[in-house]
Amino acid sequence: MAAARASLGRILPESSILFLCDLQEKFRPSIAYFPQIVSVAARMLKVARLLDVPILLTEQYPEGLGPTVPELGAQGIRPVSKTCFSMVPALQKELDGRSQLQSVLLCGIETQACILNTALDLLHRGLQVHVVVDACSSRSQVDRLVALARMRQSGAFLATSESLILQLVRDASHPQFKEIQKIIKEPVPDSGLLSLFQGQSPLTSC
């Protein structure tokens, strides 16, 4: 029964963590829909703060690729520098110190590189991975689509930001619901997902 429940991919604030991967200045010109995915990642960050979900932020080689973009709203969160195409080695101590952790919500770039490798490492550790599809992108939309399919095939859950936010809050009687409602009432920017998924089979062939 425990395994069956785990396979549903339910998330709770007390056993979840938000990963924000490499949303840095030098990627701005090259990543498809960069402003849009940063905007969605920012709403996930706001909700995580309201619900006391821990947040971890990485930067890939910041000396060359620059700092995290200010519009993410991550001021006050200490970024962890890395060179590996996975967040996990740099965050190993943080993960090891969280015995209640079950679910990781994953946002950032690039989908086929650091997001995919992070997801695989987390799955290998026995954690549930929830890829926030409207908060992840790549330079190539083909890479983005195939990487999402690859993660799903490996056992990750694909979900939109609003779906995950509502799973976290669970109930309109939650004391933070009115604040969260303001966030989800703001229009979600188009990050090209409809055109990306239309007529494609990789997401449905598992």
Swiss-Prot record:
Tissue expression per record: Ubiquitous. Expressed predominantly in uterus, stomach and urinary tract.
Transmembrane segment boundaries: none
Sorted UniProt keywords: Acetylation, Cytoplasm, Nucleus
Cell compartments where the protein resides: Cytoplasm; Nucleus
UniProt modified residues of type N6-succinyllysine: 26, 93, 178
GO annotations of cellular component type: mitochondrion; nucleus
Lineage: superkingdom: Eukaryota
Keyword Nucleus (UniProt): yes
CDD domains from the UniProt entry: YcaC_related
InterPro entries hit by this protein: Isochorismatase-like_dom, Isochorismatase-like_sf, Isochorismatase_domain
Main location: cytoplasm
PTM-bearing positions, type N6-acetyllysine: 93, 178, 182, 185
Quaternary organization: Interacts with CDKN2A.
Similarity field: Belongs to the isochorismatase family.
Name of the featured protein: Isochorismatase domain-containing protein 2A
Organism: Mus musculus (Mouse)
